[in-house]
Amino acid sequence: MSEKYVVTWDMLQMQARKLAHRLLPADQWTGIIAVSRGGLVPAALLARELGIRHVDTVCISSYDHDNQREMKVLKRAEGDGEGFIVIDDLVDTGGTAKAIREMYPKAHFVTIFAKPAGRPLVDDYVVDIPQDTWIEQPWDMAVTFVPPIGGR
C-alpha cells in the first residue's frame, strides 16, 4: 500500500450517520450483523442512529494488521440474513464480502469505505478509497504527546 487515509472518530461518526440516513426507514430491519472486528464500531453507530437493538456478529479473520491472509470463519450469526443489515468498515479486494454474500444472501450488505475491487459486492457504501490506499481506523491509533519544536 503506497498511501494512507487517516480516519478520525468525528469523520467515522459523520460517515455512519450518512449511511444510516440511506437505510431509513429503520423499521424495515430486524437487526444488524457486524463483521468482526472492523464492523463492530460502525454497527454500534448504525444501531444507535436507527434505534436497532438486535445486534449480532459474524467473526471472520482475514487480516493480520496490514497483511491479508487466509480467511477463517470463527463465528457466524444464524439465518440467511433476511431483514438484516450486514456491516463492515470497508470492502477491499472483496474476499470477505464474497464470503458474507454466501453466508447471508438475503442481507443488505453495507460498508463505510469501499475500494474499486470490492464495490460491486456491497449494496451501499459512503466513501470511495483508491485500491492502493491503507485505511487507518481511529480504533487502531492513539493520541500521543509531541514535544514542541522549539524545545519548550
Curated annotation (Swiss-Prot):
Transmembrane segments: none
One cellular-component annotation, GO: plasma membrane
Residues bound to guanine: D92, I135
Gene3D superfamilies the record matches: 3.40.50.2020
Subcellular location: Cell inner membrane
Pathway recorded for this protein: Purine metabolism; GMP biosynthesis via salvage pathway; GMP from guanine: step 1/1; Purine metabolism; XMP biosynthesis via salvage pathway; XMP from xanthine: step 1/1
Function summary: Purine salvage pathway enzyme that catalyzes the transfer of the ribosyl-5-phosphate group from 5-phospho-alpha-D-ribose 1-diphosphate (PRPP) to the N9 position of the 6-oxopurines guanine and xanthine to form the corresponding ribonucleotides GMP (guanosine 5'-monophosphate) and XMP (xanthosine 5'-monophosphate), with the release of PPi. To a lesser extent, also acts on hypoxanthine.
Protein name, entry field: Xanthine-guanine phosphoribosyltransferase
Gene: gpt
